[in-house]
């Protein structure tokens, strides 16, 4: 069995820990590197020290050292960090699984350009359940296109820095696409004061931040006499880690190209 040699960015964070544990427990994967910011107190420590069973892989801030033995980099960090990693990986043929959210238009364009040099999986949510939910939303939108108001409500922990979540935005894009629209043309990102009657063609967003909520998303289709709610709730980040490994397996035979979890799951 060929071993996937995988490095993890943000190795000392909560998601980094979950990814490292999943890689160490996978029969077809090897932890080959670990990265974190230069100011992290974890630099120079064993990447699996939190598990009480050292891996022999030290957390590095230098990309050349941290990625020296890697064929893949899984990155759930922040846009500015991911874009630095992206440049290095594209130049060295290292495949990337990007779960970072909050990219602007230029950042997304940089990812697309890098995909001409290496294979990239870019998805706002690696959970299999979330991505099946996306397909359900596409089907629902096609059937609730007239007479139903669409609202997307998402909740995350107090430390999440971007809003709405990347997953909520992707849900909006899927719904808008199913209706033959562009999300930016119909999205209402917030409401305050005297807003007037609701535009029936709009897609509304509401954001909640608090506690340790990992990620809850509900899409409401509200019609006359009935409401349909399609929800996904994350109880552990382990689903993101398992989805990331599934994404790496999908990329294993790809040289270049930009993919998302819909490709992995055959939901196109």
From Swiss-Prot:
- What is the annotated localization of this protein? Cytoplasm
Note the PROSITE patterns from the entry.
Answer: DAPB (PS01298)
Which residues carry out catalysis? 156, 160
Annotated residues for binding of (S)-2,3,4,5-tetrahydrodipicolinate: 157, 166-167
Q: Which pathway does this polypeptide act in?
A: Amino-acid biosynthesis; L-lysine biosynthesis via DAP pathway; (S)-tetrahydrodipicolinate from L-aspartate: step 4/4
Catalysed reactions, as listed in the record: (S)-2,3,4,5-tetrahydrodipicolinate + NAD(+) + H2O = (2S,4S)-4-hydroxy-2,3,4,5-tetrahydrodipicolinate + NADH + H(+); (S)-2,3,4,5-tetrahydrodipicolinate + NADP(+) + H2O = (2S,4S)-4-hydroxy-2,3,4,5-tetrahydrodipicolinate + NADPH + H(+)
As recorded in UniProt, its EC number(s) are 1.17.1.8
What InterPro entries does the annotation carry?
DapB_C, DapB_N, DapB_N_CS, DHDPR_bac, NAD(P)-bd_dom_sf
Which GO BP terms sit in this record? diaminopimelate biosynthetic process; lysine biosynthetic process via diaminopimelate
Superkingdom, natural source: Bacteria
Q: What positions does the entry give for NAD(+) binding?
A: 10-15, 36, 99-101, 123-126
Question: What is the role of this chain?
Answer: Catalyzes the conversion of 4-hydroxy-tetrahydrodipicolinate (HTPA) to tetrahydrodipicolinate.
Which PANTHER family does this one have?
Answer: 4-HYDROXY-TETRAHYDRODIPICOLINATE REDUCTASE 1, CHLOROPLASTIC-RELATED, DIHYDRODIPICOLINATE REDUCTASE
Protein's UniProt name: 4-hydroxy-tetrahydrodipicolinate reductase
**Which lineage?**
Bacteria, Pseudomonadati, Pseudomonadota, Betaproteobacteria, Burkholderiales
Gene from which the chain derives: dapB
């Amino acid at each position: 069995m060929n071993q996937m040699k995988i490095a993890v960015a943000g190795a000392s964070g909560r998601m980094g820990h979950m990814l490292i544990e999943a890689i160490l427990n996978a029969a077809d994967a090897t932890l080959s590197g670990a990265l974190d910011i230069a100011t992290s107190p974890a630099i120079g420590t064993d990447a699996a020290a939190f598990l009480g069973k050292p891996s022999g892989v030290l957390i590095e801030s230098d990309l050349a050292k941290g990625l020296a033995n890697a064929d893949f980099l899984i990155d759930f960090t922040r846009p500015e960090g991911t874009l630095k990693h992206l440049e290095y990986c594209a130049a060295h043929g290292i495949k990337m699984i990007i779960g970072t959210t909050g990219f602007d238009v230029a950042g997304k364009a940089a990812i697309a350009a890098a995909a001409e040099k290496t294979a990239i999986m870019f998805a706002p949510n690696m959970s299999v359940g979330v991505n099946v939910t996306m397909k359900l939303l596409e089907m629902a939108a096609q059937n609730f296109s007239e007479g139903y108001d669409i609202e997307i409500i998402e909740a995350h922990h107090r430390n999440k820095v971007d809003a709405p979540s990347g997953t909520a935005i992707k849900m909006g894009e899927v719904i808008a696409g199913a209706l033959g629209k562009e999300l930016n043309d119909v999205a209402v990102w917030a409401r305050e004061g005297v807003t007037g009657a609701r535009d029936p063609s709009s897609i509304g967003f509401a954001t909640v931040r608090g506690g340790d909520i990992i990620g809850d998303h509900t899409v409401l289709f509200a019609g006359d006499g009935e409401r349909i709610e399609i929800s996904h709730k994350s109880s552990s980040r382990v689903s993101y880690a398992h989805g990331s490994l599934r994404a790496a397996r999908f990329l294993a035979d790809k040289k270049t190209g930009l993919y998302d979890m819909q490709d992995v799951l055959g939901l196109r």
